[in-house]
Amino acid sequence: MDRKKAVKLATASAIAASAFVAANPNASEAATDVATVVSQAKAQFKKAYYTYSHTVTETGEFPNINDVYAEYNKAKKRYRDAVALVNKAGGAKKDAYLADLQKEYETYVFKANPKSGEARVATYIDAYNYATKLDEMRQELEAAVQAKDLEKAEQYYHKIPYEIKTRTVILDRVYGKTTRDLLRSTFKAKAQELRDSLIYDITVAMKAREVQDAVKAGNLDKAKAAVDQINQYLPKVTDAFKTELTEVAKKALDADEAALTPKVESVSAINTQNKAVELTAVPVNGTLKLQLSAAANEDTVNVNTVRIYKVDGNIPFALNTADVSLSTDGKTITVDASTPFENNTEYKVVVKGIKDKNGKEFKEDAFTFKLRNDAVVTQVFGTNVTNNTSVNLAAGTFDTDDTLTVVFDKLLAPETVNSSNVTITDVETGKRIPVIASTSGSTITITLKEALVTGKQYKLAINNVKTLTGYNAEAYELVFTANASAPTVATAPTTLGGTTLSTGSLTTNVWGKLAGGVNEAGTYYPGLQFTTTFATKLDESTLADNFVLVEKESGTVVASELKYNADAKMVTLVPKADLKENTIYQIKIKKGLKSDKGIELGTVNEKTYEFKTQDLTAPTVISVTSKNGDAGLKVTEAQEFTVKFSENLNTFNATTVSGSTITYGQVAVVKAGANLSALTASDIIPASVEAVTGQDGTYKVKVAANQLERNQGYKLVVFGKGATAPVKDAANANTLATNYIYTFTTEGQDVTAPTVTKVFKGDSLKDADAVTTLTNVDAGQKFTIQFSEELKTSSGSLVGGKVTVEKLTNNGWVDAGTGTTVSVAPKTDANGKVTAAVVTLTGLDNNDKDAKLRLVVDKSSTDGIADVAGNVIKEKDILIRYNSWRHTVASVKAAADKDGQNASAAFPTSTAIDTTKSLLVEFNETDLAEVKPENIVVKDAAGNAVAGTVTALDGSTNKFVFTPSQELKAGTVYSVTIDGVRDKVGNTISKYITSFKTVSANPTLSSISIADGAVNVDRSKTITIEFSDSVPNPTITLKKADGTSFTNYTLVNVNNENKTYKIVFHKGVTLDEFTQYELAVSKDFQTGTDIDSKVTFITGSVATDEVKPALVGVGSWNGTSYTQDAAATRLRSVADFVAEPVALQFSEGIDLTNATVTVTNITDDKTVEVISKESVDADHDAGATKETLVINTVTPLVLDNSKTYKIVVSGVKDAAGNVADTITFYIK
């Protein structure tokens, strides 16, 4: 039977079954058919889903979309058929079947308004169809680039982001992360990447058009902004459009350059009456006005950039500094020469080097003008008149017979000077004042025949006067006021709130808004206005140009409304818009302001008042971006977030935790579930903050690697109002309105097994210690195995048995002898994570000596070495091969003679060694090849080598004597290094380093820290006594002048070297005030007799705690109490810190917050363990003062036998913060 017939037969059977069920609802066979059809339909739903999901998951590729459609259509048909069959069959299970079908259908196939995880196949089809449409756009854009079609490229450049922004949410609805990621990476990411690669190209093209349009519209600021972006981006365009865009940009830049180059638009001239005259008829005392196309920078307008030359001979005309000035708006240059021009002469004014406010230079240009032969007024003077011109008149009464003198630049014809041509008129009434006018040479004298009225305005007019040569004298008018005053300021500008500005200082905190309001501090300010009163009434028409509000930095005049109250002589200034916040402004009252009598304020009375507006705008968070995205962040990598604010901040620090104490900053990284109103120390993730150089208000928030956890959500919180330390602006006046929260998630659960990455020799993770070749070892040798990730340390994951030893035989690698054993211990890295294991060769079987061995990490499916997620190491990793046996130096001693007899204890030792002794070196290997002088190197403290010979003892093959060529120095520490010795089979003897000290000369007293006869000595000051060499038991006494002994102190032997001693007063104990004391030190240091070395001193009133805690002694600790060592020695014989913890006793209570202890194996010249501050414990002191530091009561540290270790303790301090000296001692 073929497949089609089978399908038809199955369909017919199903229909028949449906009919039978309808007639026989209780028939078991019918029920079985319904269940089968329902089950088959559900299977088809899942098959349609698996068609895309399994293909993507297993192959990493998309299935043929036609296959997905086919299975999708089958699923829809199966659903319809199954629903019809269930409805026809009816029965008790009808509703359950229908509900089950609907649920499965809507989950896997289709639903009208699906939620996340529903309608999986339909959603995939929609997403795939959209993605292919997006890919078609990408291909069109790619083709445009290949064809170098810039117009088409720009078209699709804009289309693609619109699609991505408005429709790629379809991709996010697809069920299955693998499928979503493949859709994004294949279609969305590729389209975005291609589009983004053209960002500079399209921006240059758009900005070039913007320049052209802005230039045409006269918006040069907009054109300049676009030009700046073209210059920034043009070097970054792709090769595809570089040629075309370079040409496009050039055209735009040329258009901008032509429009932006400022220039002198026109030149005009006026006479002394402020009337315009032709440039061909300029009077000798005329004034030039140069009108500019743009506001000039005042600093560039001067007599060097505006110059005047005689045209004939190009001879410069001398101008004084004050002759050239610039208007307030910066657009008019006035040239008013102090020296008159020559009559009937042609001049030119040359402009060169002037710049606008943006630094752009004006076009160089020249303009000619010509002087006429008419006579002009050069001076007007008298003792009784004040006026508004540059002529020389003074204030005072003006009586009958007083005179006014007018001087011209040429001789005048006397017959033309009379009371008809020279008049004085009352401005108010028009009445002529009787005068007598006479002339002498070029001067007209006007004699009053009637007194002028104080405060009244008069007009002097001269008309129809001629020169002796027949030329006209200029028509001249002068309005003046008899005995008038300049309009000086009576009350400086004052705000509505009552703040009065002043000259010479900046007034801050001025409310800058037109409407009244309250700042963040809660202070109310009325609206913005300034009132100023004057000593006289004003000419209101002169206010606009001479009473101005200016933004200081830009020089821009602020549009303002001026109101004048003549009765109150008050000017009110109100800006037409709110002022900029946090900005300096100036109110300028300029010389051109006139009184109602026409009297000018004058330069001497000009005023400038400066004020700064309040900052009222709270900062906002513009954006938070993550360097690695906001989802799936890797916990083993450092993460970086960029936070950008709307303005600069006062401060921006990370929140930190010390123990359970939280120190709040302005930002914190916390766990997703943290309650921001009640954060705990465990909620906060360590983070750091750094400002981004060159970017205002921008900061980097950094989280180090391994601080975050897998499969977790987190918040980056920028704190606002209500927080302990909210974000504030740079003025510290305004606060971020509310908390800003940025969320992100980390990568999912770890399913990757750990692997071995490196092996290091010793307890080390330094690259210098990495094992790359065969290496000699012996029992006690350590290796550090580094793994690819953090390891589990519980349930025996890192214990013995996890690493075994094998040796190489003729039959290959076999288990090492039973006596060869290893131990395994966890090791933390710099981030406090266990990412390594320290393997110690705890035993070495005799049969394995001189064999080649290897370490093997054994796999185990259930309890092998595993990461923190429980993934067990999969491979049986061979780590390293090495020779097992390493011979060592047994000891180095001082020998009395060359036969090695009467030797001292083994070095190192503080016992004084005679300077004539030889050194006896003993090896534990009897079959040595040779020991040469270069194998035994002895050096003094300065590093100078000691010459000597090496000989073997008679009958001995492992004992050698080093005999110095000269006697050693007294009281000197010598180091001994034995290296390079080999046995006869080629094994290298382990390098060995030790030291000894020679006997010292008789010691002397070097110094006492308090001078003899000192006064005002600090009553708590530590007293230091120093000897030239070791003095084990000096006798030191302290007593008052009356003989009363003072013993409430501890005599501290600094560093236990018997050379420096300190008298440290007991806690809370001080010397008496203003009292004389005597400090005595015995001359015979061993017997304590004959006390005659002493100082006397007198105390003051001061007693400060500047005393560092001092080491009192080194001893042992039994868990509850401290026992001082009997001998003052730095050499202790200790097997391990667990059985025999070492205790250090200090002179006072100590604080170990920053204390550190390092342990160095000086035999092998390496640091073998660093004990953190948690491993030193002051709480074990039996008393409450905590004076004892106990080493290794928390972290066990077993030491190697026969090795010498150096212990260094640093960072111990007392309650006052005084840090103790670093302490060094040795154990073996």
Curated annotation (Swiss-Prot):
Keywords tagged on the record: Cell wall, S-layer, Secreted, Signal
Source superkingdom: Bacteria
InterPro entries: Cu-Rt/internalin_Ig-like (IPR014755), S-layer_SbsC_C (IPR041378), SbsA_Ig (IPR032812), SbsA_spectrin-like (IPR054605)
Transmembrane annotation, as ranges: none
Pfam families, per the entry: Big_5, SbsC_C, SbsC_spectrin-like
Entry GO terms, CC: extracellular region; S-layer
Compartmental location: Secreted, Cell wall, S-layer
Signal sequence annotation: 1-30
Record function comment: The S-layer is a paracrystalline mono-layered assembly of proteins which coat the surface of bacteria.
Protein's UniProt name: S-layer protein
